[in-house]
Curated annotation (Swiss-Prot):
Pfam families the UniProt entry points to: Ribosomal_S14
Species of origin: Ruegeria pomeroyi (strain ATCC 700808 / DSM 15171 / DSS-3) (Silicibacter pomeroyi)
GO molecular function, one term: structural constituent of ribosome
Function: Binds 16S rRNA, required for the assembly of 30S particles and may also be responsible for determining the conformation of the 16S rRNA at the A site.
Name this polypeptide is given: Small ribosomal subunit protein uS14
One GO biological process term: translation
Assembly description: Part of the 30S ribosomal subunit. Contacts proteins S3 and S10.
UniProt record similarity statement: Belongs to the universal ribosomal protein uS14 family.
Length: 101
């Protein structure tokens, strides 16, 4: 299980990304619009740089919803490979059966 501080840090990042998503998108649109004056675009870049680092979506890391494990994450189920195996063996995931050949 991941440290609680790491799980909370990731939750905080998710909140910040959601909070600043609209503002960040607006500033990016202004900064990348070549029809606008260069000075206005530069000011938008400066404002974008002043936003909190953790408000950027690229800083998010997928974590298992049950354990907080950051590696071997299955996006579709939002769990790690270990929990996928445990839940699958326990019959908690509909349609998943243990393979045999």
């Amino acid at each position: 299980m991941a440290k609680k501080s790491m799980i909370e840090r990731e939750k905080k990042r998710e909140r910040l990304v959601a909070q600043y998503a609209a503002k960040r998108a607006e500033l990016k649109e202004i900064a990348n619009d070549e029809s606008r004056p260069m000075e206005e675009r530069f000011k938008a870049r400066l404002k974008l740089a002043k936003l909190p680092r953790n408000s950027s979506a690229t800083r998010l890391h997928n974590r298992c919803q049950l354990t907080g494990r950051p590696h071997a994450y299955y996006r579709k189920l939002k769990v790690s490979r270990i929990m996928l195996r445990e839940l699958g063996s326990a019959g908690q995931i509909p349609g998943m059966v243990k393979s045999s050949w």
